[in-house]
Amino acid sequence: MKKKLGLLAMVVALMAIATGCSETGQPITSKSTGIWNEYFVYPLSQLITYFADLFNSNYGLAIVITTLIIRFALLPLMIKQTKSTKAMQALQPEMVKLKEKYSSKDQATQQKLQQEMMQLYQKNGVNPLAGCLPIFVQMPILFAFYHAIMRTAEIKQHSFLWFDLGHADPFYILPVVAAITTFIQQKLAMAGTAGQNPQMAMMLWLMPIMILIFAINFPAALSLYWVVGNIFGIAQMYFIKGPEIKASKAGKAGGSSK
C-alpha cells in the first residue's frame, strides 16, 4: 500500500507539472487571487526576489539559495519518511511469510491476513502510512516553488552562468545533469528495494527520462532548481543511508571472496 502511494505521488507530481503549464503563463503578483497564489506561490516568489535583490539581481543564485532553504526545511520530513521506509523493509521477511500462510484469495482468508498484518505493525510500532504523509506534505510546497519560478517575470529577464534563466539551456547541459542526478538520487533512495518492487524499479528509469524531456523544453531556471534539489537529495540520502549501503556492499564483497 505504502509503495503504491509513493508511486502515485511521483506520477501525480509529474502530471501536475505537465497540466500546470496553462497557469504558469500568468505572472504572479501581489494582485494574484486565490488561496494557492496568495499563500503558496506569491510568498515563494517574493523570497526568490528578496535574495536576488540581496545579490545584485542574481536570480540564478536566488533560486539556488531558496531551493536549499526549502530542502533544509523539509529535511525532518524526509528523515521521518526514510526511517519509516527502513522499518517497513525490516518487516518484509515476516510479511512474506504471512502472505504465504494466507495465500488463498477468498475474503475470509484475506481479512485474516490484514488482521495479522496490523498486529505485526502494532507489535513493532510501525505505521504503514507514516512514510507517505511526508510525500503529500512536500508536494504542494515543491509544486508552489515550481510555479514561483515559472511565474516570476523578473527571472526570465536574467541569466546565470552560461544560460538565460527564461530559456531552455542551449547546450543541454542542465537537462542532462538534472536527469543523471535524478537517477542517482532515486538509486540511493531505492537501494535494496528495487528488486522487491518492479514498479519502483520502472520509476528508477522513467523519472530521469521524463525530467530530461521536461528540462529540454522548459526554462533553464526550472532545470537549475531540479539540479540543486537533486544534489541536495543525493547528499541527504548518502548521509541517511550511506552506512547501510556500505554495510551491504561489504557483506556482498565478503560473501564473494569466500
From Swiss-Prot:
Q: Which of UniProt's keywords are assigned here?
A: Cell membrane, Chaperone, Lipoprotein, Membrane, Palmitate, Protein transport, Signal, Transmembrane, Transmembrane helix, Transport
Where, per UniProt, does this protein localize? Cell membrane
Its transmembrane ranges are 59-79, 129-149, 160-180, 202-222, 223-243
* Any one GO molecular function term: membrane insertase activity
Q: Where is the lipid attached (N-palmitoyl cysteine)?
A: 21
Claim: Chaperone is one of the keywords in the record:
yes
Q: Which residues form a coiled coil?
A: none
Q: Which region is the signal sequence?
A: 1-20
Q: What does this protein do?
A: Required for the insertion and/or proper folding and/or complex formation of integral membrane proteins into the membrane. Involved in integration of membrane proteins that insert both dependently and independently of the Sec translocase complex, as well as at least some lipoproteins.
Which family does the record assign? Belongs to the OXA1/ALB3/YidC family. Type 2 subfamily.
Q: Which HAMAP family match?
A: YidC_type2 (MF_01811)
PANTHER family, per the entry: CYTOCHROME C OXIDASE ASSEMBLY PROTEIN COX18, MITOCHONDRIAL, OXA1
What protein name does the entry list? Membrane protein insertase YidC 2
